Amino acid sequence: MNKESFFLIFSAFGVFPVALAYGAFPSFSLPLLYNIEITSNNLSNVFRAIMGLYVAFNIFWVIGALNFSLRLSALWSLFIFYTGAGAGRVLSIVLDGSPDMIFILYLSLEIFGSAISFWLITVSYTHLTLPTIYSV
């Protein structure tokens, strides 16, 4: 297995439990893990939607790890996922203050994951060029 496929699968296995923690049983897991009380069905719906996005990304990353033609797209989606989640956490720290340590750990992993995924994209796929759309 090459390093790109390994990192895609490694990330999927790391993110999947977080997805389940957010959405499988939010009224049980969120108070226990994150000190977040679910006070309405709307809040459960939001966390289950987040779970759905995380699971969908996980599926795509595993497919990309197994299918060369989708690997670069899967790496880009991994980079966007880590960068977007990390940027949101940084924004929250700036606007809301420091969260519990588990979210600082998540931020550290997102920064690391973003850097590794971008490195894999640039090192492994710099030989590829965009097709010429117009010929003169």
Where are these regions (language model features)?
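Cytosolic juxtamembrane helix and N-cap/initiation of the first transmembrane helix
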Residues: M1-G14
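Hydrophobic transmembrane helix segments
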Residues: V15-N41, N45, M51
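Aromatic-anchored segments of alpha-helical transmembrane domains
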Residues: P17-V18, F81-V90
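Core segments of alpha-helical transmembrane spans in multipass integral membrane proteins
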Residues: N42-I63, I80-G84
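Juxtamembrane helix-break-helix junctions at the cytosolic face
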Residues: I59-A74
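Membrane-helix boundary connector in multi-pass membrane proteins
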Residues: A87-F103
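Membrane-water interface at the C-terminal end of transmembrane alpha helices
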Residues: G113-L128
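Single conserved hydrophobic/aromatic residue that forms the stacking wall/gate
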Residues: H127-V136
